[in-house]
Amino acid sequence: MTINQLLQKLDTSSPILQATFGLERENLRVTTDGHLAQTAHPSQLGSRNFHPTIQTDFSEQQLELITPIAHSTKEARRLLGAISDVAGRSIDQSECLWPLSMPPQLTEEDIIIARLENEYERHYREGLAKKYGKKLQAISGIHYN
């Protein structure tokens, strides 16, 4: 019996079926020729420190898209799609959001550590770069919360 079959047999009031969900997706901003964008975080999105759903992850080029709490996986996917649309429309016209987890063509020099206002956050990212290298931090993906 699969997990889906087991879940379908549960009473709808079962606590496991009352779960909430959240998704986080990291995307690199790249130019149309597949190189990392060298532009700053899109100003149309406002402050990355306070935007509830679109922030910056490790690098200046790495957007982090964050859904609010959803009450179903379908709702979480819908929210992520809407946030992705906003992000895609907010970046420079010569850029796109790289859809894969492995980065395109890049060198350590191409990766700009996020220009964050919070000194602790900046130092944290600089420490990651020294310990693991910038390329490893550029790997992007989806996180399920």
Mark where each language-model region is.
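Residue-level recognition of well-ordered beta-strand positions that form the cores
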Residues: 28, 66-68, 145
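Extended, Lys/Arg-enriched charged tracts that mediate electrostatic binding to polyanionic substrates
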Residues: 117, 125, 145
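Catalytic micro-motifs at enzyme active sites that drive phosphoryl/nucleotidyl and oxygen chemistry
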Residues: 13-16, 51-53, 121-136
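A broad, structural surface signal
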Residues: 25, 78-92, 122, 126, ...
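Long, contiguous juxta-domain segments that are non-catalytic but functionally important
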Residues: 1-48
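A short, structural micro-pattern
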Residues: 21, 57-59, 136-140
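Active-site acidic/histidine clusters and adjacent loop/turn architecture
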Residues: 41-117
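Histidine-centered divalent-metal-coordination microenvironment in nucleic-acid enzymes
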Residues: 26, 136-145
